[in-house]
Amino acid sequence: MARVPERVIAIEKIADETNIKSLLEKPVHVLSGGERQRVLLARSLIGNPELLVLDEPAQNLDISGQLAFYKLLEQIYQSRSLSILMVSHDLHMVMATTKKVVCLFHHICCSGEPQIVTKDPEFVSLFGNDMAEMMAVYQHGHNHTHEVHDHD
């Protein structure tokens, strides 16, 4: 019996983790936006990174696709204990799905947990009181502490 190479086993594990097993034989050009994002995410996990850098990862996804993608990111974050740096202009999703926010406007205006950032005077001056008040703020769904690593 032939031994299955470790690389094949690793790829199958990632395909299961990102729910792309049924997509492996399909050409990329026929995939939906959400399917394509999951394939790209799976590809980025192959090297077992400690950090994922995502630039507008939910762009061009409908709202249900965005929610599914962010849930998948949360699962990967939890299971792999990796860090995720995400660039996004979608303030509602950022505030609802992240644990730490860095707000940039020519410089770092403010940073911290979403509920702190939305009250920061620089955030309020950029987006106004109404925007700050209507931001959906992330509600952490389980009870434990996270180790935070700040690198200056």
Where on the chain are the PLM-derived regions?
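Conserved ABC ATPase "signature" region
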Residues: 5-23
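ABC ATPase nucleotide-binding domains
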Residues: 119, 127-152
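Catalytic Walker B motif of ABC-type/P-loop ATPase nucleotide-binding domains
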Residues: 52-56
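H-loop (His-switch) and adjacent beta-strand-loop-beta switch element
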Residues: 101-114
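Conserved catalytic motifs of ABC-family nucleotide-binding domains
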Residues: 48
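H-loop/switch region of ABC-family ATPase nucleotide-binding domains
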Residues: 88-89
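Conserved ABC ATPase signature
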Residues: 27-31, 35
